[in-house]
Design a protein with these regions (language model features):
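Glycine-rich, basic loop-to-helix element that forms the pyrophosphate-binding segment
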Residues: 1-13
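A short, conserved alpha-helix in the catalytic core of glycosyltransferases
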Residues: 89-97, 101-106, 112-139
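A short, conserved beta-strand element in the Rossmann-like catalytic core
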Residues: 25-28, 113
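Short, flexible, basic/aromatic active-site loop/helix in glycosyltransferases
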Residues: 67-88
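Short beta-strand-to-loop acidic/aromatic patch adjacent to the donor-nucleotide binding site
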Residues: 16-26
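Active-site-adjacent helix/loop segment of glycosyltransferases
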Residues: 132-229
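Active-site acidic short loop of glycosyltransferases
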Residues: 13-16, 107
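Conserved donor NDP-sugar-binding/catalytic core segment of glycosyltransferases
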Residues: 30-64
């Protein structure tokens, strides 16, 4: 998967700053300035996201904001964004990553088969664990050919994403998944009782193992983000 390839690449490179892009992209050397390099070397940011353009030089939606619509998780995307503003995730995985912070998050979850939910998983987790992804308008990259649109289908990968990122509740200085969340998950998953219970228990154990790494929960995160953009 895309995430697995990036995980492997992160383990092999020596530098702490890693630019992830596709061989169908072009980046002009004119944009590589001392000012840009100084920005990208900032160690407080998980990922710097560039402005992206199609092969027809049309802006792509690089600013992504999490929201809850009718009780369901959703992402609102915008092609216009302020420099150094936050975004939930890097479009098409493209950006300058801080390798140490990336590895500290555990990298991409290889068990997720959906590119979209694999990307959303580490993106939401990064914010829940106190990281941030920032848009850098001075870094501009364009595609040289067509590209595939994101497949946001709610599949099995979404269920694992839901358990790991949307189900935990943050109390005091740690996070946990309430047992009562199981019935909500059971109805949402369309899985049989025993299979749903097994996956739910695995997720509870994972959250328990990492409970002190959480700095907030999804509900609080999304509310704060929406207030910032009012």
């Amino acid at each position: 998967s895309t995430g697995e390839m990036i995980n492997l690449g992160m383990q092999e490179v020596r530098n702490n700053k890693v630019l992830v892009l596709w061989d169908t992209m072009h980046i002009s050397t004119k944009v590589i300035t001392d000012r840009l390099l100084t920005t990208l070397l900032n160690d407080d940011v998980l990922c710097f996201v560039p402005f992206l353009f199609t092969d027809q030089m049309q802006n792509l939606p690089v600013k992504n904001i999490p929201s809850i619509d009718d009780g369901s998780f959703n992402v609102k995307s915008f092609s216009v964004a302020q420099d150094f503003s936050k975004t939930l995730y890097p479009f098409d995985f493209v950006g300058v990553y801080d390798k140490n912070r990336f590895i500290n998050l555990g990298g991409f979850d290889y068990t997720l088969t959906s590119r979209y939910w694999q990307l959303l998983d580490i993106a939401v987790r990064s914010y829940l664990w106190g990281e941030k992804t920032i848009i850098c308008s001075n870094l501009r990259i364009n595609y040289e050919c067509d590209f595939s649109l994101e497949d946001t289908t709610l599949d099995k990968s979404y269920l694992r994403f839901f358990l790991k990122n949307l189900s935990p509740r943050f109390v005091g200085d740690y996070a946990y998944i309430p047992k009562k969340e199981f019935f909500s998950y059971l109805n949402r998953s369309s899985l049989g009782f025993f299979k749903a219970f097994k996956t739910f228990k695995m997720a509870r154990n994972w959250v328990s193992k990492n409970k002190f790494r959480f700095k907030t929960d999804a509900q609080t995160l999304i509310s704060a983000w929406e207030n910032e953009n009012e």
